[in-house]
Amino acid sequence: MTGKKAPAGLFAARKLRRKRLKFRWSQREFRIRMLDLKRKYDPLEGAPMARGIVLEKVGVEARQPNSALRKCVRVQLVKNKKVVTAFVPRDGGILYVDEHDEVIIEGIGGPRGRSMGDIPGVRYRVVMVNGVSLKALWEGKKQKPRK
């Protein structure tokens, strides 16, 4: 007859808790959180948003089965000089973004902080251009300031 896998006594709570804590290290999300790996490898360094300068406009081809050129920009972040690709949302949104503009980017909202939908390798999206919301520009509520 084989023994029990876990203690089942009246005073076994501490032992059970310690055992559970030990096995948490086999969970991916726990390891990433405890070792602070997001801050280490994320270009935004764990921040929800970041400021950057537009280097160029690029068209990224959509994944199968879709066929489109998703309008994106290459952005150099101010805080660490890293270059990332950010999606410019809305129909005609790219018309409000020019090279050398200052933009604010945020995560695009894909699973586990990755790319979303049919846009391969793009993890961020543009939310502001030269201090004005891209949505306000697109709706015609505000004018884009010249810097």
Curated annotation (Swiss-Prot):
The keyword RNA-binding applies. Keywords: Ribonucleoprotein, Ribosomal protein, RNA-binding, rRNA-binding. Pfam families: Ribosom_S12_S23 (PF00164). GO terms for molecular function: rRNA binding; structural constituent of ribosome. GO terms for biological process: translation. The keyword Glycoprotein does not apply. It comes from the Archaea. GO terms for cellular component: small ribosomal subunit. Gene3D superfamilies: Nucleic acid-binding proteins (2.40.50.140). Belongs to the universal ribosomal protein uS12 family. With S4 and S5 plays an important role in translational accuracy. Located at the interface of the 30S and 50S subunits. Part of the 30S ribosomal subunit. This is Small ribosomal subunit protein uS12. The gene is rps12.
